[in-house]
Amino acid sequence: MLFSCTFQLQAQEYVQQTDLPTIYIETEGGRPIVSKEDYVDAVLHYVDSNGVKTYDALGVRGRGNSTWNLDKKPYRIKFAEKQEFMGPERAKAKSWTLLANFADKTLLRNAVAACIGDFAGQPFTAGAQFVDLILNGTYLGNYQLSDQMEVRKKRVDIDEQDEIPTEGANITGGYFLEVDGFGAAEPVHYKTKRNVLVTVKSPDEEVIIPRQIEYIKNHMQLFEDALFSSDFADPEKGYRPYVDSLTLASLVYFNRVDR
């Protein structure tokens, strides 16, 4: 996807509104962002104590499930070229998110969970940089700049399967799955016996084959069955052979913190 932003911008001064960085987004022709599927061409100005940095080839669209229906909208940014948008310590990538945190009146839960994840040594936790967001001249408030959840170095760093497997190929992974109550609209999803909706984020629908989907279903079902069995705590008969216990415990804890 190539974003072309040759439209004329009105001259204005881009200033840092508070001690936080300020992000100015100006869409082509001032078009509103009303879709979670269609990107709107835009220019972005990132202002902090180091000055103004301008990105002139990107698109912006909505994101989220239930959060997209709230008054303060979350957004996804996609640059034409990969950017170290949150610095060299994080991913170099095209896609980034602006979280509104509208349902959290402290605005802190997602960021605190990310900090705890870093402290606990989780393999990956999303970035958390608070910013002020101004869209087409209107101040929208405090947002959290963060990573897009995807398979990539310094994000979900697993072996990506980007080709259709050949007959007899090893299909044990890696796989990027999400437990998603709103995932019924996702192209690859299924439910466990306990009605847990699971979506497959990677591999993409274009390359994943039925044999891989069955492998995922079977592995996850074995885990669920063991977790809810009377032997769940047994190191051999319980859930532990199917999952890394420490990262699972961390995930459960972070989900509690993030509510």
Go through each PLM region and give its residues:
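Phosphate/dinucleotide-binding and metal-coordinating scaffold of catalytic cores
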Residues: 11-259
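Bacterial Sec-dependent N-terminal signal peptides
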Residues: 1-12
